[in-house]
Each structure stands twice: as C-alpha cells, then as structure tokens.
Amino acid sequence: MRKRLKTRIKICGMCSPEDMEMAALYGADAVGFITEVPIESPRKLDSDTAASLISKLPECLDSVMVIMPENSSRALELIEKVRPDIVQIHSNLPSVELEVIREKTDIPIIKTLSVPAGMGASRVQSPVKRLLDEVRRLEESGVVDSILLDSGIAGKTGGTGYVHDWDLSRRIADETELPLILAGGLKPENVQEAIRIVSPYAVDAASGVEILGKKDAVKIRSFIEEVRCANAFL
C-alpha cells in the first residue's frame, strides 16, 4: 500500500501577475501557464507572455509550463525560451520524444493522460486498460517524473471542467509508483472528497477557482483551505 502524503496544490491557467499573487498568498505550491497550445482557451498565453510572467513568479511557487508540442524539438524550443521549473506535456508525444527532452534538459516532466468522463467503470474498461498499459510503459521507461489525470470528453483530452470517475483514478494510482496529479472539474466543493478517494500526490484546479473566466481570490483561498482540511486527516 502506498504511503499517504499531504496533497500538494497546483493552480493552473495563470494569466496575470495578480493571478500569481493570489496563488502565492493563499499557499499554492505550483502554478500552471498554458503556453502556445493549438486550441482555443481563455487561459492560453503566447511564449513571450509566459516567459515574462514566470520571470516575476514569487519564489514560493513552482512554475509549470503546459504545452501541446508536436515533437521534442518544439518542446525544447519552448523550454529554452520560457524557462519554467517543470514542463507538462499535454499531447500524445511518444516516449522516444519524451526521452529526447529528458536527455537534453534536466527539467522535471509531467505527462497528462486523459480519463473518460461521463461514464461509469463498467463502460470504460477498455480505455482504462489502455491507460494502465501506458502508465506502466511510462514508469518502466523512466522518461517522466509524474502523471496528471484529466477528464476527457467529446474529443477533448483535458481542460473540460468535467469530473471523471475518481475510482478509476484511484485504480491507476494504486498501479503505479509515479506521483499522480488529479485534475478535471476540481473545485472547493468537491476537492476534499477527491483527495479522500484518490489520495493523489497533488490536485490541479483551473476553472474551478474562476468566476466568468477569471481567477477569483475567494475561490482560490477556499480551494486551498479545503485541501488543507483533507490533509489534516492524513
């Protein structure tokens, strides 16, 4: 059985210095910058803006650059320009490409994996088997430092704001030694229950701490307080 550790907190989708200040003030551990992704998102930044924000980041926070690169060359280009503490690969980059990033940088790598949302366990046996197989391959290859499970729905592999079946995430967590970050529809009202079920290394929130597409101080504070309450029972 895995030893339960206190769950860390990542607030994703930073767009301004004010967003970063709120995350730092209330005690987040890391913040995410969605950079140069080829999809529409209100949180998408160009690489110049991401680099500028990260250069001003409070020292108490780790910076996570979230990217969807088509190959390792593009990932390395963005890492060199933006200079985050951690890179999160939110695309189907094969292990051989991840290995190139690993060999050419010493930056920790998070690999996003998509868990089907809106289905019970009986309907997702095949997707979950594929996920488990992929997690095992990633762990055996040693090309990533952690995995992030996000909710996929209607062709989108994450950032949907939907919750998936946390029992599926717990099953994956129990099958790997890789640190597991839980995302997908997390908000102050449900994060304690998510932590109780999954026991993740970290939780990741974006839209769940926003009002009308903007980060909200009350929601960020409440989210972090709820995580701390969950941690108090560990």
From Swiss-Prot:
EC number from the UniProt entry: 5.3.1.24
GO molecular function, one term: phosphoribosylanthranilate isomerase activity
InterPro entries assigned to the protein according to its UniProt record, in alphabetical order: Aldolase_TIM, PRAI_dom, RibuloseP-bd_barrel, TrpF_fam
Top EC group: isomerase
Pathway linked to the protein: Amino-acid biosynthesis; L-tryptophan biosynthesis; L-tryptophan from chorismate: step 3/5
Catalyzed reaction equations: N-(5-phospho-beta-D-ribosyl)anthranilate = 1-(2-carboxyphenylamino)-1-deoxy-D-ribulose 5-phosphate
Keyword Signal: no
Short name of any one Pfam family annotated for the protein: PRAI
Lineage top rank: taxon: Archaea
Keywords: Amino-acid biosynthesis, Aromatic amino acid biosynthesis, Isomerase, Tryptophan biosynthesis
Biological processes annotated in GO: L-tryptophan biosynthetic process
PANTHER family xrefs: N-(5'-PHOSPHORIBOSYL)ANTHRANILATE ISOMERASE (PTHR42894:SF1)
HAMAP family: PRAI
Family assignment from sequence similarity: Belongs to the TrpF family.
Protein name, per record: N-(5'-phosphoribosyl)anthranilate isomerase 1
Gene transcribed to yield this protein: trpF1
